[in-house]
UniProtKB/Swiss-Prot annotation:
Belongs to the RuvA family. This is Holliday junction branch migration complex subunit RuvA. It comes from Stenotrophomonas maltophilia (strain K279a). Residues 1-64 are annotated as: Domain I. The RuvA-RuvB-RuvC complex processes Holliday junction (HJ) DNA during genetic recombination and DNA repair, while the RuvA-RuvB complex plays an important role in the rescue of blocked DNA replication forks via replication fork reversal (RFR). RuvA specifically binds to HJ cruciform DNA, conferring on it an open structure. The RuvB hexamer acts as an ATP-dependent pump, pulling dsDNA into and through the RuvAB complex. HJ branch migration allows RuvC to scan DNA until it finds its consensus sequence, where it cleaves and resolves the cruciform DNA.
């Protein structure tokens, strides 16, 4: 199993990134919480990883903080929840915000996260409430900001679609959040914050 990677950021376009470790490029899927704090291309990064192997695919997920990886794993223990929804949780709210929602039984706030309906939110509260206090952000690693992609509006729209939003809704959210000069991570962060209000 691969538990951690340290290498050079070779590529990043939400939700995908490639980390070059001694000449081997590891492709990882990561939540927006990780993308917000990734160093720029060509800089070193250390990521906590989660390796997943299924019949037809092998996936590697990356997180800047141990607490995010722990939450990613715990959320998937809830029946009916997979990696896509776990990534949406970490892309929409912080570990601490999610813990507060679960502890308070705030079904309404949980259903604002893409892919989570009322029944799923209720299951999350029921199955995670006892562990919610243990969700911790963990230590943050050195961060930086990357260069703006060629088309942050388009990239943000694609990233929002991959988080579970319908194409028209993702395009509207990205347009509403976009300001000239914004990086893709900024557009996505503002769009998700707006959607969760």
């Amino acid at each position: 199993m691969i538990g951690r990677l340290r290498g050079i950021v070779a590529y990043k376009a939400p939700p995908w990134l490639v980390v070059d470790v001694n000449g081997v490029g590891y492709e990882l899927e990561a939540p927006m919480s990780t993308f917000y704090d990734l160093p720029e291309l060509g800089r070193e990064v250390t990521l906590y990883t989660h390796y997943s192997q299924k019949e037809d695919s092998v996936s590697l997920y990356g997180f800047l903080r141990e607490g995010e990886r722990r939450l990613f794993r715990d959320v998937q223990k809830v029946s009916g929840i997979g990696a896509k929804i776990a990534l949406a949780v970490l892309s929409g709210v912080t570990v601490e915000e999610f813990a507060r929602m679960v502890q308070a039984g705030d079904i309404t706030a949980l259903t604002r996260i893409p892919g989570i309906g009322k029944k799923t939110a209720e299951r999350m509260v029921l199955e995670l409430r006892d562990r919610a206090a243990q969700f911790g952000a963990g230590g943050a690693l050195p961060t930086g900001s990357g260069p703006a992609p060629a088309d942050p509006l388009s990239d943000a729209t694609v990233a929002l679609q991959q988080l579970g939003y319908k194409p028209a809704e993702a395009a509207r959210m990205a347009r509403d959040a976009f300001n000239e000069g914004d990086e893709v991570a900024t557009v996505i962060r503002k769009a998700l914050q707006s959607a969760l209000r």
